[in-house]
């Protein structure tokens, strides 16, 4: 009787493992700006964000929206296309974007606005460098930036 029970459990586990997973490959052919993805984050609205060597990409489950460096200084945008890291702020509706040599960007995804933080040699409170490689949320609602 014990052998039958063990056999039944084994068969049940095999059947439960046979459930198919749906995997979707996303790349430049689907609208991603570059296949070299350096960071991925999910915001509070459920959107996926991809940091690449050629811009910031927002995926809504169907299509990509790409945010590139804005050369027109009268409009808002990210300060560089070569990105290092992403962090969805645990408190606010802000996506933090670390760039290579172009500072730290804060994207408010509710109001669709960007803020930029750069190194300023005249301001000791500014970033120590414009190359932001990692952003981590601290327990006290501050950010650790390297």
Where are the language model's segments positioned?
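Carboxylate-rich, polar loop motifs that coordinate divalent cations or form catalytic acidic clusters
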Residues: 1-146
């Amino acid at each position: 009787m014990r052998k039958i029970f063990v056999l039944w459990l084994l068969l049940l586990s095999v059947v439960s493992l046979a459930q198919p997973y749906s995997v979707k490959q996303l790349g430049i052919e689907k609208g991603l700006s570059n296949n070299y993805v350096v960071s991925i984050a999910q915001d509070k609205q459920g959107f996926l964000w991809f940091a690449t060597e050629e811009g910031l990409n927002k995926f809504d489950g169907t299509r990509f929206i790409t945010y590139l460096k804005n050369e027109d200084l009268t409009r808002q945008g990210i300060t560089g296309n070569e990105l290092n890291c992403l962090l969805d702020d645990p408190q606010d509706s802000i996506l933090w974007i670390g760039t290579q040599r172009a500072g730290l960007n804060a994207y408010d995804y509710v109001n669709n606005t960007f803020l930029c933080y750069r190194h300023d040699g005249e301001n000791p409170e500014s970033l120590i460098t414009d190359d932001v490689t990692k952003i981590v949320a601290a327990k006290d609602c501050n950010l650790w930036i390297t």
